[in-house]
Regions:
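Helix C-cap/helix->beta junction micro-motif
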Residues: 19, 123, 182-183, 297, ...
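Active-site PLP attachment segment
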Residues: 209-245, 257
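Active-site phosphate-binding strand-loop segment of PLP-dependent enzymes
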Residues: 132-201
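N-terminal small-domain helix-loop-helix segment of the aminotransferase-like
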Residues: 2-87, 94, 143, 270-271, ...
Length: 380
């Protein structure tokens, strides 16, 4: 993607607005936002400073991030490990600008979030791409090993994976750790969906793997954890020396993040585990509702552990395996917007899968399923 290109998310959302379609494409919730977070932000706006906060982030939020990961993932961190950024994407950018030198090769795993490739390129790096193997979307470790060359300096990972929702196991991360140690590689892991896991699969961060802990960067997002994507509050977590390098790039990107939102995120991360469990249960029920409706209509939905998305296998569903063409037809003819999974590929795309977002009201999901079922019936 060039800097002037429109992303597939903006394209499909624009079509949805223009055509009055249900938007199951772009990943944002259409549900009531957490009142606790709104109230915390309002208090902070009225009672606390609205001037520049510290460049690395408010100490309270950095400490809250460390405490949250200690509680939920058993990571031993302090505020010195945390750099607050304006969203997870800025954390990715600051990290890659800190880690990549011109000519460095960086391994990317596709399907991938669309920011990875341009950020590597803007840092002067050269991307080498490894593909997950559908329909289980497994990471081929042998292909990863073969891709490592004398110019390889790092690997970008994503768990849970957007768009397909699969997760990297501890065993897989340990194997990656052995490769990283052998070749002196850094690992940048996009973990923004870590709180959105619905089947009991444990989320494992590279920071929890001894061979990776000192050479990895973890990217997180308050927008995803609290389902408030417009807040754009994120963070990078790394060993102090790595964190300092990332901070050096962050200061020339956004410098800092709105303080009221940082205060609110800090309060949110300290909420009891029951709050987070209730949020997951709500989304788990919405996912089950969409999946059961799609399956009843004859669509084959692939298993996924996390994220806000489900993936339809087009060929297995008896549909034409051209996801770009089908997604355009769906938004225009069925009035339901989706995202073609091929849009998440840098090269050699898989074209037989569509991504749908389930974080919508039950009635909206039911209406979308009815429209998709009618479209499928018309195809015969």
């Amino acid at each position: 993607m060039t800097a002037s290109q429109t992303t597939i998310f903006e394209h499909m959302s624009g079509l949805a607005r223009e055509l009055g379609a249900i938007n199951l494409g772009q990943g944002f919730p259409e549900l009531p936002e957490p009142p606790e977070l709104i109230a915390a932000a309002q208090r902070a706006l009225g009672e606390r400073s609205n001037q520049y906060p510290p460049m690395r982030g408010l100490p309270e939020l950095r400490g809250a991030v460390a405490g949250y990961y200690a509680r939920t993932q058993g990571l031993e961190l302090t505020a010195d490990n945390v750099i607050v950024t304006s969203g997870g994407t800025e954390a990715l950018a600051a990290s890659l600008f800190a880690l990549v030198a011109p000519g460095d090769e960086v391994l990317l795993v596709q399907p991938l979030y669309d920011a990875y490739l341009p950020l590597v390129q803007w840092a002067g790096g050269v991307a080498k791409v490894i593909s997950l193997v559908p329909p289980q979307w497994t990471l081929p470790l042998e292909a990863l090993k073969v891709a490592i060359g004398p110019k390889t300096r790092g690997i970008v990972l994503n768990t849970p994976n957007n768009p397909v929702g699969t997760m990297l196991s501890r065993e897989t991360l340990e194997a990656i750790g052995a490769l990283a140690e052998a070749h002196d590689l850094w690992v940048l892991c996009d973990e923004v969906w870590e709180a959105m896991v619905f089947d009991g699969t444990p989320h494992v961060s590279p920071l929890a793997i001894p061979s990776l802990a000192q050479r990895s960067v973890k990217v997180g997002s308050a927008g995803k954890i609290f389902s408030m994507t417009g807040w754009k509050v994120g963070w990078a977590v790394a060993a102090p020396e790595l964190a300092a390098r990332i901070a050096g790039r962050h200061q020339f990107l956004t410098f800092t993040t709105p303080p009221a939102l940082q205060w609110a995120a800090a309060e949110g991360l300290a909420m009891p585990d029951t709050w987070f469990a209730a949020q997951r249960a709500r989304y788990r029920a919405l996912k089950a509702r969409l999946v059961s409706g799609l399956e009843a209509a004859g669509f084959v939905v692939l298993p996924a552990s996390g994220t806000w998305f489900v993936t339809i296998d087009l060929a297995a569903s008896g549909l034409p395996a051209d996801d770009v063409v089908l997604s355009e037809r769906l938004v225009r003819e069925a009035k339901v917007a989706s995202i073609p999974v091929s849009a998440f590929y840098a090269e050699r795309p898989e074209t037989g899968f569509l991504r749908l977002c389930f974080t919508k009201d039950e009635a909206v999901l039911d209406k979308a399923v009815a429209r998709l079922a009618a479209f499928r019936a018309r195809l015969g």
